[in-house]
Amino acid sequence: MQDIRNIAITAHVDHGKTTLVDKMMLAGKLFRDGQDNSGQVLDANDLERERGITILSKNVSINWKGTKINIIDTPGHSDFGGEVERVLNMADGCILLVDAFEGPMPQTRFVLQKALEIGLKPIVVVNKVDKPNCRPEEVYEMVFDLMFSLNATEDQLDFPVVYGSAKNGWMAEDYKTPTDNIDYLLDKIVEVIPAPKVLEGTPQLLITSLDYSSYTGRIAVGRVHRGTLAEGMNVTISHRDGKLEKTKIKEIHVFEGMGQKKVEEVHSGDICAIVGLENFEIGDTICDFENPEPLPPIAIDEPTMSMLFTINDSPFFGKEGKFVTSRHVNDRLQKELEKNLALRVRPFEDSTDKWIVSGRGVLHLSVLIETMRREGYELQVGQPQVIYKEIDGQKCEPIEELTINVPEEFSSKMIDMVTRRKGEMTSMQTLGDRVDIEFDIPSRGIIGLRTNVLTASQGEAIMAHRFKEYQPFKGEIVRRMNGSMIAMETGTAYAYSIDKLQDRGKFFIDPGEEVYGGQVVGEHVHDNDLVINVTKAKQLTNVRASGSDEKARVIPKVVMSLEECLEYIKGDELVEVTPKSIRMRKITLDHLARKRSNKD
């Protein structure tokens, strides 16, 4: 049997996790000479590369001096908490990557806590030590304190530390003596991380993720917990609800480099993919045909936020997307449920074209919307709503831990902003000329906070947050004060009319764009909504020469990303998402009907 090490790599967003995996693959000779290894091999999905975040976990294996190292890349964001937990179940140890300047961040804490609970032993890698002003030794102390506060065992606290720079491709015992390769880290992995325990007995495998191939259908991925599985073997699938189902394994694959390799049998400790099973979900156990003994299923974080999804019914529907009917959208949401553990979908009040979709946060849901948009779907999404719970007869809401790191001169602004949104400051630390402020804040208060924080700190703030717990309802929060500017009728927007209306507020459209009546085209300076006509062109007669009049000077439009739109809209507005554009609109397009319903 080959010597195996299963290792998960955990880190905060953008501390260089995916870069490190690239370098490990390079060291394991996964690329032939001259093969394109432009980096970020694992973040293969376009969205992941653009945002620089890992959303789905991946598996890769490398060979190092005769030992097979299975590397599992985990998402760092707590919005993808469902992913993190099940991935750590496959590992025997973890690498905790920390930025030598920023130190441990809320998300690091989130992933580390899960890893320590399962009992994994960490190797701490202090990365980016080539950055100016970094403080590797302090960061090491901070990590130790963090683990101590998370109730780590003595064995876990006796962790090895590796210093280095993944980007420049070196790792060493001491940051003052750089080497020119990352061998030190790989040797440490083989030395420190335990080999998987070999458990004899009837086979058990917990399904922790899914793969899909159009050729063989759904594929179950997991780690063999005990015993041996072989091709053509009869097995029982034990479902989460306790139902048992007899079936047969067609093929078994193990991860080899970037791809997969077909094998006859796998032993305990192997991570493998199993082809040919029909009905299974994540969290089911594949066990012995005669005496099934299921493993305990994975606990998954409950969703904390929900949104209303509806089909696109605006005047421009079907012009830009391929999939626009309710059947298309419904099938796509059902397909997403198979892979996306923390997601919930239910029809809205018996309607066939409206769904309530719940997830872990705005980021989690907006990644789903953005993915659908790129696949050619058109849909509309309502304002994100927090999921309340009734605990001991009291209305409770989700509270998050929020960390803001800003230059000192902006700290009072930040505290003011967060406390207005019912946040409570829990700690404040000064590090050099920057301040680290921690708050407990309702999830409702975080919606739309990021844009304001960045504006107020001139783009200098680093903001991170993660779900903490449910607490009693904190009271009303004042959201955006300004009203919307609404297009009066459908047509093309003209520079002439936009120019005349500039003093009324900021515009979200450029001259020449098509608009429809009821579309939100700008933000009004006052708190009431204003219906404006942007489709009016300049009347030219033979009295007026076209040249002598003054030119229209139009300020460029405010460009908003999908998340910003979702956080910006009010309760009576929707975001319309199509492959080519993101528009905001009123739910009731007709102005008179809208006035009437406001009176009621």
Feature locations, PLM:
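A short, contiguous, amphipathic alpha-helix enriched in charged residues
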Residues: 314-338, 551, 555
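Canonical P-loop GTPase G-domain recognition
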Residues: 121, 131-191
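Alpha-helical scaffold elements adjacent to nucleotide-binding pockets in ATP/GTP-utilizing enzyme cores
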Residues: 19, 23-24, 83-86, 90, ...
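Interdomain boundary/hinge elements
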Residues: 36-42, 150-162, 196-206, 242-255, ...
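Conserved nucleotide-binding/hydrolysis modules and their immediate coupling elements
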Residues: 204-307, 317-319, 482, 491-541, ...
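Residue-level signature of catalytic and energy-coupling elements of molecular machines
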Residues: 14, 20, 52, 73, ...
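P-loop NTPase switch module centered on the Walker A-proximal segment
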Residues: 1-98, 102-104, 142, 210-213
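Conserved structured catalytic cores and adjacent interaction surfaces
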Residues: 2-19, 91, 101-113, 119-121, ...
